Each structure stands twice: as C-alpha cells, then as structure tokens.
Regions:
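Extracellular/periplasmic catalytic domains that process cell-envelope and extracellular macromolecules
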Residues: 10, 39-43, 75-78, 127-131, ...
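Proline-centered loop/turn at the N-terminus of a beta-strand
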Residues: 46, 81, 132-136, 156, ...
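Structural detector of well-ordered beta-strand residues that form the stable sheet scaffold
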Residues: 48, 114, 134-136, 180, ...
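Catalytic-core regions built around general acid/base machinery
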Residues: 98-134, 151-154
Length: 206
C-alpha cells in the first residue's frame, strides 16, 4: 500500500500524451512523435489513458496515489503493447530513496505486461501488433542517482536532457538510465516543451 504523491495541478499526463500522439499535419496545435500523418491518411498510435491518482481533499495541489500495478495489468489485458509511465514514488531523503526497492506487486505487473501484452487470454496467440510488451518509465526528477523502478532491468528507463543536450538539472541519473530525451528546463528562457493541456489548450512544461 505504498502511497504515491505527485503534483496533480500541472496536467503532466495530458502534456506527455500530446508529445507522444498529437496528430501530425492537421494544422492544429502540436505534432506528436507517433501522431501519424493526417494529410496522407496515416493513422498514428492509439492511447489508453489509465487514471491511477485520486483527488486529495486536504491538498488540491497534491494527488493521492492509487495502484499503478493494477493499471499496467489492465492495459495489457485491453490491447496496449507499450506502457509509458511518468510517475513514481516519492521519498523524503536521498538515503531513503537509495535504500528503496521496487514493490513486488509493481514488479509482477511489469513482468506480466512484458509477457502478455498483445496476446489473447490464453497467452498463446498474438492478437496485437507485437508479441509481448514494452514498459517505459521516467527516471524521475529528484536529481538523485537511484530510482527503484528505473533500475529494474526489464524497464526501459528514460532520463531528461536540457536544450544544450546536457542532463536536465532535475533528472535522476546513473548507468541504469537507458536513454535520454528532451524534457525541457525552466532554467532556459525558451527551454520548455510545448504540448497539449486539458480543455483543448496548449502550454509549456518541463
């Protein structure tokens, strides 16, 4: 029953969704990395949005966490073959984070997704675009050398780089990070990433 606490007021999930899947070449807003090509009738990726956070009545700026493991398993059973996660656990100190390990129920859910995504209920017949799934997690934004989820070997862990192609000042880091991508940086006057926000709007975030 680990408690997830995240900044809930910044619409991070919607922003990431636009970065991944906003429709390309439709003359509207921004273009996603896998948004297809509207002009040429090429369909982009589809998204399954899994809400795992709950409203916190005591602090509207913070959400209470649900169970990300349940969401990952549900996604595998409902057609997803890539699980993109930019959430994680929070720790009061670097020492507490360094001692942390991935919770067993989350590890099991990740393993389940990798093994069963794209397959039928028997696990023997491929029904999706690929046999088995890929699980991606953000490295985290604590400027620390450890993240228990990112360090789990089957996970593809993504760090963040700034506009000058150095590590973003907030990104966690270490040899367990598999790849890095532009994540924005508020330390630069024009360093944040433009993407979608709730309410048919757009905004810059890091």
């Amino acid at each position: 029953n680990d408690l997830l606490i995240v900044d809930g007021h910044n619409s991070h999930g919607t922003h990431v969704a636009g970065t991944v899947a906003a429709v390309n070449n439709n003359g509207i807003g921004v273009s996603g990395l896998a948004g297809g090509d509207a002009k040429n009738g090429i369909k982009g990726v589809g998204l399954l949005s899994c809400q795992i956070f709950q409203h916190n009545p005591n602090d509207p700026q913070k959400d209470l966490g649900g169970d990300g493991a349940v969401a990952i398993k549900w996604a595998a059973d409902n057609g997803a073959v890539i699980s993109q996660n930019s959430w994680g656990y929070t720790y009061e100190t670097a020492e507490e984070q360094a001692a942390a390990t991935i919770p067993g129920h989350l590890r099991d859910a990740i393993d389940y997704f990798i093994e069963n995504a794209g397959m039928d209920k028997t696990g023997k017949t491929q029904v999706g675009p690929m046999k088995g799934g890929v699980v991606i997690f953000a490295a985290g934004n604590d400027t620390r050398e450890h993240d228990p989820i990112g360090k789990y070997e089957p996970v593809i862990c993504v760090g963040s780089i700034a506009p000058d192609f150095t590590r973003a000042y907030y990104s966690n880091y270490g040899d367990w990070v598999d790849i890095a991508a532009p994540g924005g940086s508020s330390k630069y006057s024009q360093g944040d990433v433009l993407s979608t926000l709730p309410g048919n709007s757009y905004g810059y975030m890091q």
